A protein has these predicted regions:
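Polytopic alpha-helical membrane proteins, predominantly small-molecule transporters/carriers
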Residues: 1-283
Length: 283
């Protein structure tokens, strides 16, 4: 359980760092780029992927490149959502991206749906709608629309990443290989984009990005390790991770960033947690 707790804490610390960094004048895109630099190195050292025997012709490079483009884009949307919608709503939306992944598994991979899984998906979608509509109550119309857009982007974006990862692994590539390659491509593409934009490089963004990458990778590594150690209890890992991230996100939003828990947000939170429990029971 300590691994799940630590993984969830690292996940929320990523969001807290991004939110604080923006307020202190850091460049989110530079941070995201350097985050993938350290994540690539750590992924190679931790998971030890067999990159030497990759088949150049058989590897779906287009998928790796797409993932390399999507990852930093979604990370940037996450940073924007944290600023406009807040950490509380953003963490819930990110965690509930799993319901879209499950719907994709049903339609694309012919995965069977039980009544519990269907209930979890329905509750999850309803929860996200509550979060989006609760954003409509903001007095700032422009901030309001941006918050709704970025919340939706986070929800859909993380689901797309999950779907692409599942599809890539279904083609026979090992997860450590995919993870390392997509981190490398995400770093390269992010750096190229920043050079094209003639970005003013600052050492503080590099340092913050490396810290971001350390937390981001720790979240992934600890979560994978928890699944390995608790391989006979995947529901505990799934439910524990998602519920703890949501709860930590709520606590951070309320006590660190002084966000308000509106009625619709509270309803979304309750429905989201209920959805996670249903999905965990369905595993």
């Amino acid at each position: 359980m300590e691994l799940i707790f630590s993984a969830a804490l690292c996940s929320v610390l990523v969001s807290i760092l991004l939110k604080f960094a923006k307020n202190k004048g850091f460049d989110a895109l530079q941070m995201i780029a350097w985050n993938y630099a350290i994540a690539s190195i750590l992924s190679y050292l931790w998971f030890k992927p067999d990159l030497a025997h990759i088949s150049v012709s058989a590897t779906p490079w287009w998928l790796i490149i797409v993932l390399g483009m999507v990852l930093p884009s979604i990370f940037l949307c996450l940073a924007k959502s944290l600023q406009t919608a807040g950490i509380l709503k953003t963490e819930i939306a990110q965690r509930l991206s799993v319901v879209l992944s499950l719907l994709a598994a049903y339609f694309l991979f012919q995965e069977q749906f039980s009544q519990l899984k269907m209930a979890g998906v329905t509750l999850g979608i309803t929860a996200v709608l509550c979060l989006i509509f609760s954003q409509a109550g903001s007095s700032n119309t422009n901030l309001n629309r941006k918050g709704m857009l970025f919340l939706l982007s986070v929800w859909v974006g993380y689901a797309i990443v999950d779907i692409l990862l599942k599809y890539t692994t279904s083609l026979g590539l090992q997860f450590p290989v995919i993870l390392t390659l997509m981190f490398i491509f995400a770093f390269i593409l992010s750096i190229v984009y920043l050079f094209i934009q003639k970005t003013q490089w600052k050492i503080k963004n590099v340092i913050a990005g490396l810290l971001l990458g350390l937390l981001n990778f720790a979240n992934i590594a600890l979560y994978v390790k928890a699944h390995i150690l608790l391989k006979d209890s995947p529901a505990i890992v799934f439910a524990g991770m998602n519920i703890l991230v949501v709860l930590f996100g709520v606590l951070a939003g309320l006590f660190i960033f002084k966000e308000k828990l509106k009625k619709m947000t509270t309803l979304g939170l309750v429905l989201g947690l209920a959805g996670v429990v249903c999905l965990a029971l369905a595993i």
